[in-house]
A protein has these predicted regions:
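Conserved Class I S-adenosyl-L-methionine
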Residues: 103-173
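A short glycine-rich, Lys/Arg-flanked "PGG" loop and its adjoining helix->strand segment in the class I
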Residues: 44-60
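Residues lining the SAM
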Residues: 34, 39-40, 62
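A short acidic, Gly/Pro-enriched loop at the edge of an enzyme's catalytic core
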Residues: 23-35
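Conserved class I S-adenosyl-L-methionine
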Residues: 58-89
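Acceptor-substrate binding/catalytic loop of class I
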Residues: 78-92, 110, 131-136
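Class I SAM-dependent methyltransferase SAM/SAH-binding core
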Residues: 1-25
Length: 173
């Protein structure tokens, strides 16, 4: 859905939005761009980014970090394996960027708190962010939702940590 939304927003402003094809190949010649940006990519194809950047060109991206809103996932699905909780760690992005021949200029991660003050907000969120609890429906999780409603009513907001990281990389001259 993000490509369609970005296109609808940016095309009227004269900004083309281009998505990689299924094999992550970007439809551009080598050394085409001074800057490549992305926000919340599903996957970062570092070799392709390095290929399309001109020498000295940069890549800037904000990405979802590890275990983002993991508390919410685990509330509905139970404990997740360490391999799942550790996915999308900025150290992995740094290593992959370097392996593609890029220099990492800056890498920083922030952890924020997301508070759900009522169960309706949880339902809305899980319907929009479908990968947090795959296959989520009110019917399937009615019991857990009722328990969560009671928990929020008696103890206050359900809080989940949200992690994001910013990475800036540069193709050497």
């Amino acid at each position: 859905p993000n490509i369609a939304r970005a296109t609808a927003l940016l095309r009227p402003r004269g900004v083309p939005v281009v998505a990689a094809d299924s094999d992550h190949t970007l439809p551009f010649a080598d050394a085409t761009f001074d800057l490549v940006v992305s926000r919340h990519p599903l996957a970062t194809c570092w070799p392709e980014i390095a290929r399309v950047l001109r020498p000295g060109g940069g890549y800037l991206s904000q990405q979802v970090g590890p275990a983002s809103v993991g508390e919410l996932t685990e509330y509905f699905l139970g404990p997740q394996p360490a391999a799942v909780r550790g996915r999308r760690h900025p150290d992995g992005a740094r290593d992959a960027a370097r392996a593609a021949g890029l220099e990492v200029v800056d890498l920083r991660m922030e952890t924020l708190h997301t508070e759900f003050r009522d169960v309706g907000a949880v339902v809305y969120f899980l319907r929009k962010v479908i990968w947090i609890v795959p296959g989520f429906t009110v019917e399937r999780y009615r019991g857990r939702l009722a328990e969560l409603h009671e928990r929020i009513r008696t103890t206050g907001p359900f809080t989940a940590r949200t992690t994001r990281f910013l990475i800036e990389a540069r193709r050497p001259q």
